[in-house]
């Protein structure tokens, strides 16, 4: 079991960490900020006169744009 843990940590260290350093733009994306830049608001439910385009932070909230 210890050797499996060792190889898992080694695999993580060799593959995931260098990829995160090499491509930081693919790391974490702040969807709430992106929604605000697009003149949207993060809400639990969009009104009838709004368009839902994406999720904000968690799947329960939506980015709502006015038509």
Swiss-Prot record:
- Identify the stretch annotated as signal peptide in this record: 1-19
**Mind naming one GO cellular-component term on file for this protein?**
extracellular space
What's in the keyword line of the UniProt record?
A: Antibiotic, Antimicrobial, Defensin, Disulfide bond, Secreted, Signal
Q: Name one Pfam family in it.
A: Defensin_beta_2
Per the record, the coiled-coil ranges are none
Q: List the disulfide bonds.
A: 35-63, 42-56, 46-64
UniProt subcellular location:
Secreted
Q: Name one GO biological process term.
A: defense response to bacterium
Kindly give the InterPro entries that the UniProt entry links to this protein: Beta_defensin_dom
As one GO molecular function, the record gives:
chemoattractant activity
Superkingdom of this protein's organism: Eukaryota
Free-text function comment from the UniProt entry: Has antibacterial activity.
Note the PANTHER family from the entry.
Answer: BETA-DEFENSIN (PTHR20515), BETA-DEFENSIN 110 (PTHR20515:SF19)
Per the record, the similarity remark reads:
Belongs to the beta-defensin family.
Put simply, this protein is called: Beta-defensin 110
What is the species of this protein? Homo sapiens (Human)
Give the lineage.
Eukaryota, Metazoa, Chordata, Craniata, Vertebrata
Gene it is expressed from:
DEFB110
């Amino acid at each position: 079991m210890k050797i499996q843990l060792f190889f898992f940590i080694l695999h993580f260290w060799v593959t995931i960490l260098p990829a995160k350093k090499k491509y930081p733009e693919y790391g974490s994306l702040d969807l709430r900020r992106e929604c605000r830049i697009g003149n949207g608001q993060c809400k639990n439910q969009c009104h009838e006169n709004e368009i839902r385009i994406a999720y904000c932070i968690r799947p329960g909230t939506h980015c709502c744009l006015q038509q």
